[in-house]
């Protein structure tokens, strides 16, 4: 456990995570200073009076006088003010680093471009099914520091690439990178390898590394070693097995669960289940209770969630598909009897949309593209694409055209922030309109 007594601590970024950092230091007898680039950041009204605050920008004077800077994942380490502090030898960490220095129970750590919230929640459910006192959070739900508890027997953390950049003390009992596809290229000017390098930090000092046999970018730089366990569609220690029209989860040659017993559907969810099972096994959770959790878990909202089935038409909310890889996962192996009406658009974060093109062939696809990068997406297949300014306009355009057997799928391949507060608001708006129009 680290000693912060007498340290001049500056926290960048408020919100729930920033407040958890403030509480962490106050509990240890240290009064930090707080700054935020927003004029009225969320949580400002909850700051104790004794805590000095600076809003509407960064305070370079405070930063250069600090002994320790705790940076929000929302601010790039390449920001000139942070670069100057780093050059001056000032330590810069994030909330996950503070957490790792304190945590007394084993940590299962999960990252990846897509599927990480589902896998994190699933491993948490597996632990609960085994009667283990588990804390689940990080980049999903509660900030990690709010999970710290002497009674906790296991922590399951979802970690973003931004969080991993400022973390060096993680020693996970089991760690995974589920997949690596283009995302956040606006924060990684040197491209995919720079983004991957941030993700790879999760394996440092990990006891077991759970890698994706179908994605070489998830492997440690030096290649798979004795710490590695793999999962994949057809390859890997944990893989899918197709026999006589049925699909099984298989571990090292042994069939352990028929997927028809699961509430989750879709190949990407079956591989998520394999990854979760590999992590749970590595963390020492009993296999039987882990499999039981797989049969009861219904999935998370906004992740290929059927929000309406009416007149033979399925309306599916996959608003969490905020990058190209996530939309690819939704379209890969998707079977629709009639026409797929696909809603795409938003802020593409400088991504390359071309990998989607191969899923958009055929006579039964219609594209409805909206938002900031709608024109780029419509260009993938212009002859079947229509462009609108908003998602609502797109849905009102397609609604009279749907027939029994069709699917309306919101899987935008983009962030929502050009028109919505977050992906949840976008998904809720889709669900509301589906119920009105369907």
UniProtKB/Swiss-Prot annotation:
InterPro entries named in the record: Mur-like_cat_sf, Mur_ligase_C, Mur_ligase_C_dom_sf, Mur_ligase_cen, MurD
EC class name: ligase
Keyword ATP-binding: yes
Keywords: ATP-binding, Cell cycle, Cell division, Cell shape, Cell wall biogenesis/degradation, Cytoplasm, Ligase, Nucleotide-binding, Peptidoglycan synthesis
GO CC list: cytoplasm
Chief location bin: cytoplasm
UniProt key word Magnesium: no
Alphabetical list of PANTHER family matching this protein: UDP-N-ACETYLMURAMOYLALANINE--D-GLUTAMATE LIGASE
Function statement: Cell wall formation. Catalyzes the addition of glutamate to the nucleotide precursor UDP-N-acetylmuramoyl-L-alanine (UMA).
Classification via NCBIfam families: murD
Protein name: UDP-N-acetylmuramoylalanine--D-glutamate ligase
Species: Escherichia coli O6:K15:H31 (strain 536 / UPEC)
Gene coding for it: murD
């Amino acid at each position: 456990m680290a000693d912060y007594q007498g340290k001049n601590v500056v926290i960048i970024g408020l919100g729930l995570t920033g407040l958890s950092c403030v509480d962490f230091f106050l509990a240890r007898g240290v009064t930090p200073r707080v700054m935020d680039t927003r004029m009225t950041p969320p949580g400002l009204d909850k700051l104790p009076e004794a805590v000095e605050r600076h809003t509407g920008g960064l305070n370079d004077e405070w930063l250069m006088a600090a002994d320790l800077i705790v940076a929000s994942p929302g601010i790039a380490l390449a920001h000139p003010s942070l670069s100057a502090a780093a050059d001056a030898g000032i330590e810069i960490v994030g909330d996950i680093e503070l957490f790792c220095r304190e945590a007394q129970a084993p940590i299962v750590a999960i990252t990846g471009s897509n599927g990480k919230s589902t896998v994190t929640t699933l491993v948490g459910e597996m632990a609960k099914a085994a009667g283990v006192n588990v804390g689940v959070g990080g980049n999903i739900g509660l900030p990690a520091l709010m999970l710290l508890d002497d009674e906790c027997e296991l922590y399951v953390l979802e970690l973003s690439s931004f969080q991993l950049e400022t973390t060096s003390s993680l020693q996970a009992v089991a760690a995974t990178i589920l997949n690596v596809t283009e995302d956040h290229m606006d924060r990684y000017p040197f491209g995919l390898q720079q983004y991957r390098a941030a993700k790879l930090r999760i394996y440092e000092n990990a006891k077991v590394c759970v890698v994706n046999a179908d994605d070489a970018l998830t492997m440690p730089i030096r290649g798979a070693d004795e710490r590695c366990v793999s999962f994949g569609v057809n390859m890997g220690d944990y893989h899918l097995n197709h026999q006589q029209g049925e699909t099984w989860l298989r571990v090292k040659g042994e069939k352990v669960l028929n997927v028809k017993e699961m509430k989750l559907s879709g190949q990407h969810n079956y591989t998520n289940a394999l990854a979760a099972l590999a992590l749970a096994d590595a963390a020492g959770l009993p296999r039987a209770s882990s499999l039981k959790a797989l049969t009861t878990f219904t999935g998370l909202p906004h992740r290929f969630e059927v929000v309406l089935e009416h007149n033979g038409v399925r309306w599916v909310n996959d608003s969490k598909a905020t990058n190209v890889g996530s939309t690819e996962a939704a379209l890969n192996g998707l079977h629709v009897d009639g026409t797929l009406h696909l809603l795409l658009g938003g802020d593409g974060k400088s991504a390359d949309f071309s990998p989607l093109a191969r899923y958009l062939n055929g006579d039964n696809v219609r594209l409805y593209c909206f938002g900031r990068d709608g024109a780029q997406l419509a260009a993938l297949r212009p002859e079947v694409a229509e462009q609108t300014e908003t998602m609502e306009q797109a849905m009102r355009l397609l609604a009279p055209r749907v027939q029994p057997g069709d699917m309306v799928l919101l899987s935008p391949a983009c962030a929502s922030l050009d028109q919505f507060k977050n992906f949840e608001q976008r998904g809720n708006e889709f669900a509301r309109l589906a119920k009105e129009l369907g």
